[in-house]
Amino acid sequence: MYHYAIFGGIVLIVFGIDPGYAIVCWGAIAFQNNSYRAIGYGSVETEAHTDFNARLEYIYDELTAILSRCRPDALSIERLYFQTNQKTAIKVAQARGVTLLAAQKLKIPIFEYTPLQVKTAVTGYGKAKKPQVMEMMRRLLKLEEMPKPDDTADALAIAICHAQAAGSALRRVLYDRGTHYQ
């Protein structure tokens, strides 16, 4: 599931996270020569009637195992923004915290992006709706079907957002050094 080939150029492996506490969706992509390929995607789901601390531990353990297998160059995660439900926001923030801890313990660099940044990166429109984001993920990653659960497409989009930002930064560094990069 986490195999990729290097055919020349620089390969960047990015792991995207759409945080939650009932379900944490993830997506791993390879970015090379301005093209993307899905390496894997899925979700970590917790039982609703389980002790909340046990749910956090489960999220941490599962993501640590997945990240250890995938070995990404970077983890990108959506920056939280809640307007109404503070109780939900706090629980999602706690789940997000154990996600960040898993990456930090594995020494994976962490990058945050707003939903506006992610939507703009993948659709060109910061107010795109979920079906538009999902369709762009299917097209950009050449997937035969839509990723399930739906929030998995968001995790893949978050990964692509970082790959674009990192690719631009890498091109600038290589250009400054006089190194050719395609």
Question: Could you say what each language-model-derived stretch is?
Answer:
Residues 2-182:
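Phosphate- and other anionic-substrate recognition elements at nucleic-acid/protein interfaces
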